């Protein structure tokens, strides 16, 4: 078999090899993004399975909750661990919620995680930001606990007729 190359085919071969070399970094970046997406999806699925296991156990399995709370605790300590002074709710609570939103989107889960994190961070003098983080979590729990109770009450008691009216 004989292959003949002319000037036009050589130019097109060169341009296609240049295109391949140009597309290689883009392809590797897309591959990395896809791998990260798959890892995050598998992490989300793992968290969901752990939450199902936690809710299915009677009494609730605190070891599972500790596994669920560990990455949240690390993220909160990384974000708020060095803060000092008093909590500014208008600024700090939305930041706390954005950190929590990265892990779960349900208020009832936030409540369980925050209570576990609060139990795990006993304020002491060796770490500077722990009293700040404890105060911040307490302020968020003062909002979460009543609102979760209201939602829970509406979900469980909405079928009952109110006889007082």
UniProtKB/Swiss-Prot annotation:
**Keyword vocabulary terms for this entry:** Plasmid, Secreted, Virulence
Q: Does the keyword Ubl conjugation apply?
A: no
Q: Give the main localization category.
A: secreted
Which Pfam families does the record match to this protein?
A: T3SS_needle_reg
Q: Which SUPFAM superfamilies match?
A: Type III secretion system domain
Where in the cell? Secreted
Q: Name one GO biological process term.
A: protein secretion by the type III secretion system
GO cellular component terms listed in the entry, alphabetical order = extracellular region; type III protein secretion system complex
UniProt induction comment: At 37 degrees Celsius in the absence of calcium. Belongs to an operon involved in the translocation of Yop proteins across the bacterial membranes or in the specific control of this function.
Similarity-based family: Belongs to the YopR family.
What does this gene product do? May be involved in the regulation of the assembly of the type III secretion system (T3SS), also called injectisome, which is used to inject bacterial effector proteins into eukaryotic host cells. May control the secretion and/or polymerization of YscF/SctF, the principal component of the needle filament, thereby impacting the assembly of the T3SS. Involved in pathogenesis.
Q: What is this protein called?
A: Type 3 secretion system regulator YopR
Q: Which organism is it from?
A: Yersinia pseudotuberculosis serotype I (strain IP32953)
């Amino acid at each position: 078999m004989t292959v003949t190359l002319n000037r036009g085919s050589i130019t097109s071969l060169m341009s296609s090899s240049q295109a391949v070399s140009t597309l290689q970094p883009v392809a590797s970046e897309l591959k990395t993004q896809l791998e990260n997406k798959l890892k995050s999806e598998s992490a989300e699925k793992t968290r969901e399975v752990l939450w199902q296991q936690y809710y299915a156990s009677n009494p609730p399995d605190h070891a599972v909750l500790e596994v669920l709370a560990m990455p949240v605790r690390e993220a909160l300590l990384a974000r708020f661990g060095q803060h000092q002074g008093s909590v500014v709710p208008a600024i700090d609570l939305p930041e706390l919620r954005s950190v929590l939103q990265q892990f779960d989107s349900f208020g009832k889960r936030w409540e369980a995680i925050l209570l576990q994190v609060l139990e795990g961070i006993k304020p002491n003098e060796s770490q500077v930001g722990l009293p700040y983080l404890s105060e911040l979590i307490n302020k968020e729990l003062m909002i979460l606990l009543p609102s979760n109770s209201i939602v829970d009450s509406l979900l469980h008691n909405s079928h009952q007729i109110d006889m007082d009216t």
